[in-house]
Design a protein with these regions (language model features):
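Structural motif corresponding to the intra-repeat A-B loop/turn of tetratricopeptide repeats
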Residues: 36-38, 71, 104, 141, ...
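Structural register within alpha-helical repeat arrays
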Residues: 31, 63-64, 97, 134, ...
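Alpha-helical segment of the N-proximal tetratricopeptide repeat
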Residues: 16-52, 63, 69
């Protein structure tokens, strides 16, 4: 693992450590990033190893939080992501934090976060990711019509591509399906599949089920 694979801003954070420690932490962070999709448990182990050497670095706590999130360890993810924010992380973590609240059975808190001042300052993909979580929170509460309202925005542009667009279209399709609007749901699952250039959803399988 080459520490130079880390983003420059993270390397700057690690510059407060002695060289040997910084190099070891960097290698663990690189490994965590590379493993996060295929083996999140291994990624979490690397992130925790980095934290054991440098628990006061925001990027390290963020890495632990993201890995824990991918493992479904909502409590640990929430604690670590909040710690990263307190330490000055500039990453857009609000959607992850809100989704952890959902995972812990607190959809009301997720919805509250999505209504806050910080949420109002988000734009682009970051705003869409939080919108998806907020809609999921409404659905958790059985408020499916309200979930659809949250997702019904100009961002539902069928010409968009990428993972966030694919997830947004997928969430919209799933909500339509929950309302019994199957034909419309099929169209949006098709759009999700077309937008999903990175394979983050199972939209193609959902299309097969509905077609």
């Amino acid at each position: 693992m080459d520490a130079r694979q880390l983003a420059p801003e993270i390397r700057r954070e690690l510059s407060t450590l002695d060289r040997a420690t910084a190099d070891a932490v960097a290698r663990h962070l690189v490994a965590a990033g590379e493993l996060i999709d295929e083996d999140p448990e291994a990624a979490l182990s690397h992130a925790r190893a980095a934290r054991a050497r440098s628990s006061r670095i925001a990027a390290v706590r963020e890495a632990v939080g993201i890995a824990a999130y991918h493992c479904g360890d909502w409590a640990q993810a929430l604690a670590e992501l909040r710690a990263a924010r307190r330490m000055g992380s500039k990453s857009p973590l609000l959607a992850l934090i809100a989704d952890c609240e959902r995972g812990l059975g607190r959809p009301e808190r997720a919805i509250e976060l999505a209504r806050g001042e910080e949420a109002a300052q988000l734009s682009g993909d970051d705003a869409d990711e939080l919108r998806i979580v907020a809609a999921g929170g409404r659905a958790d509460l059985g408020q499916v019509e309200q979930a659809l309202t949250i997702l019904s925005t100009p961002q539902l542009d069928p010409g968009r591509t990428g993972s966030t667009a694919a997830r947004l279209f997928y969430a919209y399709a799933d909500t339509l399906l929950a309302l019994g609007r199957n034909d419309e749901a099929l169209q949006w699952f098709l759009r999700s599949a077309a937008a999903d250039t990175e394979g983050v959803t199972d939209a193609e399988e959902r299309v097969s089920e509905l077609a």
